[in-house]
């Protein structure tokens, strides 16, 4: 089951579904609307209200700060913000970073029991920035989170893999001129084709690789391949992701 993300116009969910259907010729690939809208639409009005309240609280609790996970309960206004975002498929929390594993657990509860099985792969496209901690506890932005459901972040494809080294060198050298000047200098120092940016037409092709990794993970428990030319390669740099 592939769930569309209407907030990302340059992400072609139909093309991605066709790719998965060709890759997994033994399986049925179903393209569905946005994940939350799909599952909320199958609940009664009272059930929807309760589900939205639970989800909004979960998203608010999963929001990460500069130091990592929050240490205090979410403010009512933060929960209301998440409620509004959940009920409007066109809204987006751009710039906010969430604990990906906490989000995954919250979304899992929406899936009907009959589809919460090993026979079903749920692949959720999202525009939210998701992160997981490294062994030292430092959170890193991710493109893909493999679990149940699997999550693919369009924003994560832009922000997760590191940009070319020239980008960071130019940014460091120009930082004394101010943050904006540093960003402009960094982007100007690198060929635009060397990294993925917002609105990039290459996003769908990039996410095909991560979708293939999700399938591999679901079938074998191992999503990656050591071959740099393989779609299953675990890219840490933008240039590896776009290879």
Which residue stretches match the model-derived regions?
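Hydrophobic beta-strand residues in large extracellular and virion-surface proteins
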Residues: 1-2, 20, 29, 152
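Short hydrophobic beta-strand segments
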Residues: 1-10, 37, 123
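Short, surface-exposed beta-strand/loop "edge" segments at domain boundaries and coil↔beta transitions
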Residues: 7-11, 131-134
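Zn2+-dependent metallopeptidase catalytic core
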Residues: 9-30
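Acidic carboxylate-rich catalytic motifs and surrounding loops in phosphoryl-/glycosyl-chemistry enzymes
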Residues: 30-38, 226-230
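Metzincin-family zinc-dependent endopeptidase catalytic domain
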Residues: 37-224, 234
């Amino acid at each position: 089951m592939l769930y569309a993300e209407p907030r990302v116009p340059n992400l072609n969910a139909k093309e991605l579904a066709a790719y998965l259907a060709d890759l997994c010729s033994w399986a049925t690939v179903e393209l569905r609307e946005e994940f939350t809208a799909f599952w909320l639409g199958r609940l009664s009005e009272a059930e929807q209200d309760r589900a939205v309240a639970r989800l909004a609280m979960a998203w608010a609790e999963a929001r990460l700060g500069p130091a990592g996970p929050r240490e205090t309960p979410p403010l009512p206004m933060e929960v209301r913000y998440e409620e509004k975002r959940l009920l409007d498929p066109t809204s987006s929390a751009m710039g906010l970073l969430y604990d990906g594993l906490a989000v995954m657990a919250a979304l899992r509860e929406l899936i009907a029991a009959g589809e919460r099985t090993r026979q079903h792969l749920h692949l959720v496209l999202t525009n939210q920035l998701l992160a997981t901690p490294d062994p030292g506890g430092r959170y890193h932005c991710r493109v893909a989170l493999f679990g149940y459901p699997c999550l693919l972040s369009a924003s994560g494809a832009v922000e997760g893999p590191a940009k070319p080294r020239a980008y960071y060198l130019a940014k460091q050298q120009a930082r004394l001129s101010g943050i904006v000047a540093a960003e402009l200098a960094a982007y100007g120092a690198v060929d635009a084709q060397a990294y993925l940016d917002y609105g990039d037409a290459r996003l769908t092709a990039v996410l095909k690789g991560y979708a293939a990794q999700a399938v591999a993970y679901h079938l074998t428990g191992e999503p990656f391949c050591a071959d740099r030319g393989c779609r299953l390669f675990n890219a840490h740099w933008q240039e590896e992701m776009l290879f």
